[in-house]
């Protein structure tokens, strides 16, 4: 994503945000006793956003029964198809417990029913939301022309996506500092609230906790060599790294190396740059994480002070995404914009 394209998408995202700002209505999920069809024999769509890959089931009326065990089996890269997460494409009105959400945000006809690779439910995934919109468009469920927007439902609230060719800008909603209970006060005063021991890195590392709205713990490193030395292989947040205080609902860990700012080709303010790795809650290390990139940009902005860039280019192992945090991400009504690709790879039919 070149800076010029990022500036164009930033304007598109702002227009989408002005037209339909995300509502913080949430879904209070319930279970239903209605018998549903098995997942066997169904068609799944495989795709990715910056190599953060997902399996999607188009199930508009929620007719298919999907268990956590089935999700975990399908996402297993050895015994299944392999993916970082699973998404049911469902009408909001068909999701149990979503009635009040649908009434609050009637334009959010479609809901991103998202699950981590271990089958656990998650609030939101930025990369998956772009792929979700692309699938809606590709399957003919909606028509989203270049420059047009769509609002979808997620467990983190409504999200608006704007198409710009092969890229999508997602209004990710507001960022929030978590302020974990038991945080060390003097660390918090300096922009840190947690310490983390990461395998492969020496000693405790200071970190900042950010909600997007799912929880993130961001650690700044000095060099790219140090970033490479972190031992993430085979780890999940359930057994490592070690956090103090320990996040009660788990967390996504981002390791980030700030890089030199990049000039804006349109003559605007410099664009911040960084390289990152992520250990996702319920998944392990992934090639990219949309909410994680947003959390990293917000943390960098917080650490940089008054002259902090409003825009960031974040390089992940899976590619580059752009994040707009604005002049003050904590201001009332402020939201974070995420820009990146969405690519459909294949359609797969499960055995009966």
Residues covered by each model-derived region:
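Glycine-centered structural positions embedded in regular secondary structure
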Residues: 85, 173, 207-209, 348
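Compositionally biased, low-complexity flexible segments
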Residues: 2-23
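A glycine-rich beta-to-alpha transition motif near the start of alpha/beta enzyme domains, typified by
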Residues: 24-165, 218-352
């Amino acid at each position: 994503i070149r800076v010029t394209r990022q500036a164009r998408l930033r304007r598109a995202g702002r227009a989408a945000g002005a037209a339909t700002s995300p509502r913080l209505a949430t879904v209070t999920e319930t279970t239903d006793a209605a018998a549903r069809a098995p997942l066997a024999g169904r068609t799944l769509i495989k795709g990715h956003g910056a190599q953060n890959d997902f399996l999607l089931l188009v199930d508009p009326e929620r007719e298919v029964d999907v268990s956590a065990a089935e999700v975990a089996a399908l996402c297993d890269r050895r015994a299944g198809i392999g993916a970082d997460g699973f998404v049911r494409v469902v009408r909001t009105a068909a999701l149990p417990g979503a009635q009040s959400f649908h009434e609050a945000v009637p334009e959010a006809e479609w809901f991103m029913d998202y699950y981590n690779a271990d089958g656990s439910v998650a609030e939101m995934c930025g990369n998956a939301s772009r792929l979700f919109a692309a699938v809606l468009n590709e399957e003919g469920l909606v028509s989203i022309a270049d420059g047009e927007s769509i609002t979808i439902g997620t467990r983190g609230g409504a999200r608006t996506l704007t198409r710009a060719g092969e890229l999508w800008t997602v209004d990710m909603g507001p960022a929030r500092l978590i302020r974990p209970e038991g945080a060390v006060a003097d660390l918090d005063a300096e922009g840190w609230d947690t310490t983390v021991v990461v395998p492969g890195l020496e000693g405790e590392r200071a970190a900042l906790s950010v909600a997007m709205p799912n929880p993130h713990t961001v650690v700044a490193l000095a060099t790219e060599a140090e970033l490479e030395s972190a031992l993430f292989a085979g780890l999940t947040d359930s057994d490592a790294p070690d956090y103090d205080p320990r996040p009660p609902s788990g967390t996504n860990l981002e390791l980030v190396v700030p890089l030199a700012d990049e000039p804006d080709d349109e003559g605007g303010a410099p664009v911040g740059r960084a390289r990152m790795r992520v250990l996702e809650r319920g998944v392990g290390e992934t090639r990219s994480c949309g909410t994680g990139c947003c959390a990293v940009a917000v943390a960098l902005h917080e650490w940089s002070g008054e002259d902090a860039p409003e825009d960031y280019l974040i390089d992940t192992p899976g590619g580059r995404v752009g994040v707009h945090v604005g002049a003050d991400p904590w201001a009332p009504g402020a939201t974070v914009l995420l820009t990146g690709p969405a690519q459909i790879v294949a359609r797969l039919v499960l055995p009966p």
